[in-house]
Design a protein with these regions (language model features):
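Long, charged, mostly alpha-helical binding arms that flank functional sites
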Residues: 1-185
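Basic, alpha-helical terminal appendages of large translation-related enzymes
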Residues: 57, 63, 93-96, 174-185, ...
Length: 257
């Protein structure tokens, strides 16, 4: 099944030994804390159906998903984002609507982050000499992300790990509550970079958010790709592990110089 789209299958056995297969959209599934299917019932009659495992999408197993219905429900950007995130091209993609919903939540969070920032005071330009430790750490993660995403997409063609890095960056921005002049400058730099880095995967949302950030209507593909600032990657401190009798007891931060 390498490189194929696969999905869960559900069925009931008929009296003659044949199987009647039900589309996953028509089945209510129960899962454990690890996301594994523990039970399933047909939505129309509430009666149990058997779990047939994960198979290549096919008419015979009735486990296909209509892409148009998913696009109509979640939008083309969300479906594309899930498809690129769920598996690298050389591996099989397991279709999971819960995963699509997760991508929709990520994009909604990103939209809220950008619009909330755009609704605040005007931002300054980042002045590296004026940044405090927290601002430097946030900016370092931004430029580490630019470096990773550029390599993942440009050299490795690994969109899934690039998207994961952008999710981590958004989580960090959500915790970065610095509303000072330089804090807002760092946030603005990060949000602009995220819009450009996500543009190959979610072009419609990226185009809209680029305008929210104050830019005129333009073709984002004509914008320069974010560049890594080598100075932003430099760490002022190093984390050292403290071990006693071979067991980790804590960590300490020490100046690099």
């Amino acid at each position: 099944c390498q490189g194929m789209v696969i999905a869960e299958t559900f069925y009931r056995e008929n009296a003659d030994g044949s199987r009647e297969w039900f589309n996953p959209a028509d089945v209510e599934v129960q899962r454990d804390d690890h996301g594994r299917v523990t039970g399933a019932r047909l939505k129309t009659d509430g009666q149990p159906v058997r779990i047939g495992g994960i198979e290549k999408m096919s008419k015979s197993k009735n486990n296909g998903v209509d892409p148009q219905s998913m696009v109509a429900k979640y939008g083309a950007d969300t479906v594309r984002l899930f498809s690129m995130f769920a598996a690298p091209p050389e591996q099989s993609l397991e279709w999971n609507e819960a995963g699509v919903e997760g991508m929709a939540r990520f994009l909604k969070r990103f939209w809220r982050e950008v619009t909330a920032h755009a609704g605040g005071p005007d931002h300054a330009v980042v002045d590296p000499a004026e940044l405090d430790a927290g601002q430097k750490a946030m900016r370092r993660q931004l430029h580490e992300t630019i470096q990773k995403v550029s390599d993942d997409i440009g050299r490795r063609h690994a969109f899934n790990t690039a998207i994961a890095a952008l999710m981590e960056l958004l989580n960090a921005l959500g915790k970065f509550a610095d509303a000072s002049e330089q804090g807002r400058a760092v946030r603005h730099e990060a949000l602009e970079a995220m819009v450009l880095l996500l543009n190959p995967v979610v072009p419609h949302i990226s185009h809209a958010l680029w305008q929210v950030l104050g830019h005129p209507v333009t073709v984002l593909e004509d914008q320069p790709w974010p560049r890594v600032d080598p100075a932003a990657l430099v760490r002022d401190t190093a984390t050292l592990a403290v071990q006693v009798n071979g067991k980790l007891r804590g960590t300490i931060e020490l100046p690099v110089n």
